Amino acid sequence: MTTPVSLPTPVGSPHFAYRDGVLHAEGVSVALLADKLGTPLYVYSRAALHAAYDAYRRGIGSRDVLVCYGMKANSNLAVLREFARMGAGFDIVSAGELQRVLAVGGDPAKVVFSGVGKQAAEMRLALEAGVKCFNVESVPELHRLSEVAHAMGKRARVSLRVNPDVDPKTHPYISTGLKENKFGIAIDDAPAAYRTAAALPGIEIVGVDCHIGSQITETAPFLDALDKLLDLLDKLAADGIQVEHLDLGGGLGIRYADETALAPADLLSRVFERIDARGYGSRQIVLEPGRSLVGNAGLLVTRVEYLKPTEAKNFLIVDAAMNDLIRPTLYEAYHGVLAVAPRAGEAAGRYDVVGPVCESGDWLAKDRDLAVREGDYLAVESAGAYGMVMASNYNTRPRAAEVMVDGDHYHVVRARETVAQLLALESTLG
């Protein structure tokens, strides 16, 4: 008689859960998806996307808040279409992202265009589309945008991205609000930059913007940044400059391991208190969440190829790799790893979960206790954000397929690449 296996609770519960000993995405077996569609495979839950967006709606209540999904986290068209249908705007950082928004019927009047390196052609495309505003990140960019807009006979709506020099206490690669980061205009220089903007042709000032980082799980960094922005609004008002909105960026963290995620309602209640007390309660608030909307709405499913014991380490070699999910390699990020169909009564071994790419840094997880055999499927959790969007073809590996589950049904929302497709883009000298 086998001992019943104790099943963990996935971080994406209830949208990812075990049923009859097998991990499911909503009503669909993850093992079935892997059998039918192959691995590596990204699996998204439509219900999880809606639940994450609803958490923001509850926190917003009747206030004037525009949620602009930070689509760099996951720009699959099916994901974008869901947020567009829910009424979201979009935070973009390239013309390509704008074209994705337009392709799914997103409202360009709800699009904010961020990014430090906007090209003139991108500015023209955004002006023609009628985006809500440009989050301008430097004075040279401001001058270029003025020239482009003036030449087109248009007025570019701008919000200057201010760098408040606030430490978000997160990984340095995803910290964006310190003075040594490349993003934004130093807050001490912002009043002069706004005066410059006010004098330029083709420019209409509409907002103030900041974004201090990502995977933040405390309110204090957000509120510190907000206080500095409100002080800036006071200075701008003294210069006769008024703004329509205050853009607080994104950055709310999610649970990867044992973190306590910051609920949107908890942050927003504090934000509303602050802006009301300072007399800016009538201003629209813009938010740019990305990870908190999609991170725990996705899994990366992979197949075990080999179990390789060595004197120093036991390696569990899978068919997914750093080219599929680079976060562990790039940030030493933690992702939970689950057996899709845990083996009852079998002793677990401790493994580093590694891929087939020819790099020592190709790993997905380290020192994980798993009871598995060759051919079993594993699910890498919290893979809905910064997963497929950061994938590459390193080692001439075609990128994974993506599937979205909706109740008891699933839809392939990105076909698996083929080597033939990769080779078709290249040519030789004859």
Predicted feature locations:
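A charged N-terminal "starter" segment
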Residues: M1-A156, L200-E204, A238, D408-G430
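Active-site loop/helix belt of alpha/beta enzymes
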Residues: T2-V5, V11, P164-Y306, L364, ...
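Conserved, mostly hydrophobic/aromatic
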Residues: L49, K72, S94, A126, ...
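Hydrophobic "anchor" residues on beta-strands that sit immediately upstream
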Residues: C68, C133, R157, H245, ...
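Active-site beta-loop-alpha junctions enriched in small/polar residues
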Residues: G70-N76, V93-G96, V116-K118, E137-V139, ...
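Short acidic, glycine/serine/threonine-rich loops at helix termini
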Residues: V79-L80, A103-V104, M123-E128, L145-V148, ...
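Hydrophobic residues within beta-strands of alpha/beta enzymes
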Residues: F90-D91, V111, F134, V208, ...
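Charged (often Lys/Glu-rich) extended helix/loop segments that serve as interaction or gating elements
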Residues: R270, Y280-G430
